[in-house]
Amino acid sequence: MCGIVGYIGGRTALPFLVDGLKRLEYRGYDSAGIATVGESGLELVRAKGKLHNLEEKLNGVAQSTGTVGIGHTRWATHGKPEEHNAHPHTDASGRLAVIQNGIIENYAELRLGLKERGCLFKSETDTEVIPHLIACRLAGHSLLEAVLAAVVELKGAFAIAVVSADFPDELIVVRQQAPLVIGFGEGENYFASDVPAIVSHTTRVLTLQDGECARLTRDEVQIHDFSGARLRRTPRSLNWNPSLVEKRGFRHFMLKEIHEQPGVIRDTLEDRIGDATGPIRLGLSSDLFADLERIYIIACGTSWHASLVGKYLIEELAGIPTEVNYASEFRYCPPPLNARTLVIGVSQSGETGDTNAALTAAKARGVRLLGITNRPESSLGALVGELIDTRAGMEIGVAATKTFTAQLVAFYLLALHLAHLRGTQSGERIREILVGLQQLPAQIEGILDTQERYITELAREFDATRDFIFIGRGLNYPIALEGALKLKEISYIHAEGYPAGEMKHGPIALLDSEVPVVAIAVPGKVYEKTLSNAQEAKARDARLIGVAPLDEPAAVETFDQILPVPVVDEILSPILTVVPLQLLAYHIAARRGLDVDQPRNLAKSVTVE
């Protein structure tokens, strides 16, 4: 959700902080602020809205020369997105500043107690209790000791950073169920919510774990647990290319990431296809799947849609009963679980608060855990032990595209691996699907090369459109859901996805000439039925757009426009049918002049429950 960044070293901190916040914009935010410590004490600048507003305010004041600083982009949870609620927040003296990503669940109780002690509050945020708590414990103690004494009173999930004009040669960071990475430099050190903020400055990083804090100086990073005990931790080398966080000539990151999907599929498949004795190489323990009775998949948002496809694949290919649950509901309506149950957590970032909380609850009940994530070093990776790395690379656009495709590929590999272990599919059928997977990148490149200009022109026709409906059947029903989600996320057009057969059970009442219907109709066992459902919409004057092959006469006759896809084995079609829907959503939103990469109210990594 929120983005936090910090610097301590010999340089002026301000340029690093501003650049770092820009690299965290993809996380979503509604205000921003910076605090630096220098010879004149603590300097604080905050602004509502985008970072350019903060930069304008910074340009209007004397530039800070402080060499220690923290920065924050806020996604509002407690208190409206106003400047007085923006971080950093200070204590009564104005000499100690705090930023936080997360939620302090017991803030109301703490706030009441602090008010009784005479503390005055200037915001409605939960974070403001933290600097006051620290200040109350500073007398006769080090900054680290005061922070630790305050942290043990907090309940919730949070990452915190603290600077003080009275301790100008250090800063303190704390992690409890919210992401925080520390970067190691030469004569300087850094921290951030995520790697993109620091990847241009260092390749040596350390991911802070839950229940840990760190004291950063120019020359040292000390790691402690919440009791104050010193811990030994070793930085790891970061294998990242800084160009991943650049647009490289594309208008938006989202468009760049759509075009990166062929390469992502190749990377996700690389070295994972074996021979007849072991056609899939996922590096997972054989015990994970022994005597397996049932699978539950937990996810949120786009990952939930990928999981619906995964359910279909696992049941179709491996014959294992599989259910997909919203992570936010799983803990409160827990299904029957036992030692022969596998729970799969799916999260692009590996830091999704609801997903990790659900996995933690499932783990306590003795189930087997597997993670599917783009960030194996994340909290999810540490929690599950066994995981499939989707290898999609950094995704900056808030609306997931290439990470969705990579999750689909991961589910294909998992389902085929289970089918091989259980003997539910012939070796020939498994090889047939694997060959088809390997051909998909070139087919997607063909879609991108031939359809971009056409979809750009098609988007012009929806300037005044207020509603869309997407329909599909079978394993393309989740793609209809994903197409609707992409459109509503970035264009702010109301869009819904339905099983095509459900149109006549209610949604058909919404149809008229002003409501376009996008139908996914590819040759296979539900092709004719999907076309029949599309005809029902056409009879109500709805404009029909088909995601279908161009060389199918029935499709050409049915649809007003076609977003063409190649004919492939039906089981492989979701990876192809989603691409035109991503392009359609992108070009409609871009034509409307919207912020495609940072849609309003959304965050890339939803770290709070």
Curated annotation (Swiss-Prot):
Its EC number is 2.6.1.16. The keyword rRNA processing does not apply. PROSITE patterns: GATASE_TYPE_2, SIS. One of its GO terms (cellular component) is cytosol. It comes from Gloeobacter violaceus (strain ATCC 29082 / PCC 7421). Keywords: Aminotransferase, Cytoplasm, Glutamine amidotransferase, Repeat, Transferase. Residues 285-424, 458-599 form the SIS domain. InterPro entries: GATase_2_dom, GFAT, GFAT_N, GlmS/AgaS_SIS, GlmS/FrlB_SIS, Ntn_hydrolases_N, SIS_dom, SIS_dom_sf. It comes from the Bacteria. Catalyzes the first step in hexosamine metabolism, converting fructose-6P into glucosamine-6P using glutamine as a nitrogen source. The active site is at residues 2, 604. It holds the Pfam family GATase_6. It catalyses: D-fructose 6-phosphate + L-glutamine = D-glucosamine 6-phosphate + L-glutamate. Homodimer. GO terms for biological process: carbohydrate metabolic process; fructose 6-phosphate metabolic process; protein N-linked glycosylation; UDP-N-acetylglucosamine metabolic process. Residues 2-219 form the Glutamine amidotransferase type-2 domain. CDD domains: GFAT, SIS_GlmS_GlmD_1, SIS_GlmS_GlmD_2. One of its GO terms (molecular function) is glutamine-fructose-6-phosphate transaminase (isomerizing) activity. This is Glutamine--fructose-6-phosphate aminotransferase [isomerizing]. It is an enzyme of class 2 (transferase).
